[in-house]
Amino acid sequence: MINYKKTDLNELDQIIRCRMEFIREDTGPQTPETEAAIQTQLQEYLKNHLNRDCFVFAAEEDEKIISIAFLLIQEKPANPRFPHGCTGNIMNVYTVPEKRRQGIAGNVIKQIMDFGKTQNLDFLKLKAAPMGYPLYKKLGFEDACSRCKEMEYKWELKND
């Protein structure tokens, strides 16, 4: 039987395992040094943020997490688009390969949607990978239309 829940620090190792599986699938294999650095950062990040401004929802079967999604809550100055000043960013939606296409990830996302409503979030946003796009559309997510184009700036990393 599948159990859906909001995780806590007792599941830290399983959360990190799923995050690393997601990263490997999404971006390919990493060097052992990069994997170790990511895992170390995740340990610290989750210890400081889990169930504060980062929530991890999961599906569990036989005490093993089989599907997971992160919700990052961001508080910012309000405007007409987000009058409560709080929005949610869904990320790292991942289901183990043998459990895909069974509605499990959809149920995990529904948990986040219900939770977000109780937190008075103005909206939830996510970046949809091609595999997840039809699911998010089915759940009611819409393509974001904005007069502003999303941009980013990256610093060059120097190897010391």
Describe the predicted segments one by one.
Residues 81-97, 149:
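Conserved acetyl-CoA binding element of GNAT-fold acetyltransferases
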Residues 44-58:
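A short helix-loop-beta-strand connector motif used in the catalytic cores of GNAT acetyltransferases and
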Residues 3-17:
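A short beta-loop-alpha structural element at the N-terminal edge
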Residues 58, 64-73, 89, 94:
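Conserved beta-strand in the GNAT
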Residues 99-111:
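Conserved acetyl-CoA pyrophosphate-binding loop and the N-cap/start of the following alpha-helix
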Residues 73-79, 125-127, 131, 137, ...:
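Conserved catalytic-core motifs of GNAT/GCN5-like acyltransferases
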Residues 109, 116-128:
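Conserved GNAT acetyl-CoA-binding A-motif
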Residues 23-45:
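Conserved GNAT-fold acetyl-CoA-binding loop/helix
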